[in-house]
Amino acid sequence: MRAPPLLLLLAACAPPSGAAVDPTPPGWEPAPDAPWCPYKVLSEGPEAGGGRLCFRSPVRGFRCQTPGCVTLASAGGSLRAHVLRNRSVLLQWRLAPAEARRVRVFALNCSWRGTYTRFPCDRVLLGASCRDYLLPDVHDSVRYRLCLQPLPLPLRAELAAAPPELAECVEFTAEPAAMQEIVVAMTAVGGSICVMLVVICLLVAYITENLMHPTFRRPSLRRQP
């Protein structure tokens, strides 16, 4: 059975198995009976339409491995953003069972910070069974803000005045891949230079002790015949 393309993408960008692992805690995995996640992308701008309905496979068994992945959490802790080194971001969220039964759809709002103002990104509507979403092709060195708000089912008239669910937000900045490679290369070069300096210091100490101050034999006290 062939693995889904998304899992292959995440596996390809993962570092070696010896790296530190941030395991997925209980409650972040999608339900076993949720094989698909329906979603709709609503583009911004004057030519934006209603968007078409799409389906994607949920991510299961994901592990955020450093240094190829950085995890950021919202203030409430129910939304997490895994910033991958291939300029994509995997969002994961969880709800209590009682809250999940009242959700009709999730609204994901995106914006990024400019010099003087914020600019909106595409808005995504996700089905109630969705617990993750992959945001591809984020720009380097741009401060993003993602907010996820659960929209409830239609309620009775006496409950309609209840306040809506607050959105969970998380902010992140994708570090340029080239900058990561430069940092790794500079770290390796710096380590090599330190090793060379230690070797040079040991050689200087050896030369100073053995060559500059040689050990002379003491003259014998015996008379020669």
UniProtKB/Swiss-Prot annotation:
Record domain Fibronectin type-III: where: 72-167
Signal peptide region: 1-19
Pfam families: Fndc10
Keywords: Glycoprotein, Membrane, Signal, Transmembrane, Transmembrane helix
Membrane topology: Single-pass type I membrane protein
Side of membrane Extracellular, spans: 20-181
Transmembrane regions listed in the UniProt entry: 182-202
Glycosylated residue positions: N86, N109
Localisation: Membrane
PANTHER family in the record: FIBRONECTIN TYPE III DOMAIN-CONTAINING PROTEIN 10
This protein's name: Fibronectin type III domain-containing protein 10
Organism, as annotated: Rattus norvegicus (Rat)
Native organism taxonomy: Eukaryota, Metazoa, Chordata, Craniata, Vertebrata
